[in-house]
Amino acid sequence: MLVGLISDTHDHLLNVEKAIKKFNEKDVELVLHAGDYVAPFVIPRFKMLKAKMIGVFGNNDGDRELLKKKFSEHAGWEIRGSFAEIKVGNVKIAMLHGNEEELLNALIENGSFDIVVYGHTHKAEIYRKGETLVVNPGEACGYLTGKSTIALLDIEKLEARIIELT
């Protein structure tokens, strides 16, 4: 099963559409958004997404109630707050935005999760800490690094790769 990972869209509508196109091309079954949508008007742009979507809030997400409402208008979509524990088969995934560095490090270090997904830094990276796969899909917006990225996560292989949106 392929899972799409995205973070830090920051209202960049064109890159949201590029990410959705890539997720649909790759037949992902689930998309995890690690926060910083920013404005609620971004959420309807995800409507062409064929997969289910689970999200968390980021530090720049202002109108959280309206973001929740926009998510609830789509079957199979949910926004869980600041943290989400997701089970895909026997794989446990922790997702948070990552702006609380102590919490992020504790989740990575404690070994309770197979995968930890976060955003916030806008820096795409994939590494292992013990048995835990840690993935930051980078910034979909491309504002800070100049690179617009997402990630694809293979649940069976417990492997991820970064995809640049072009």
State what each model feature region is.
Residues 32-33, 96, 118:
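Redox-cofactor binding/interface segments in oxidoreductases and associated redox assembly factors
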Residues 2-10, 92-98, 133-138, 162:
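Active-site-proximal beta-strand elements of phosphoester/diester hydrolases
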Residues 2-87:
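Core catalytic region of metal-dependent phosphoesterases/phosphodiesterases
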Residues 27, 112, 120:
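Conserved functional loop/turn residues at catalytic and ligand-binding sites
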Residues 10-15, 38-41, 61-66, 100-105, ...:
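Active-site environment of divalent metal-dependent phosphoester hydrolases
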Residues 52-57, 117, 134-139:
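Short hydrophobic/aromatic-enriched beta-strand-loop microsegments
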Residues 80-89, 105-112, 128-130, 135-166:
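Binuclear metal-dependent phosphoesterase catalytic core
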Residues 30, 93, 114-115:
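Short, Asp-centered acidic motifs that coordinate Mg2+ and/or phosphate
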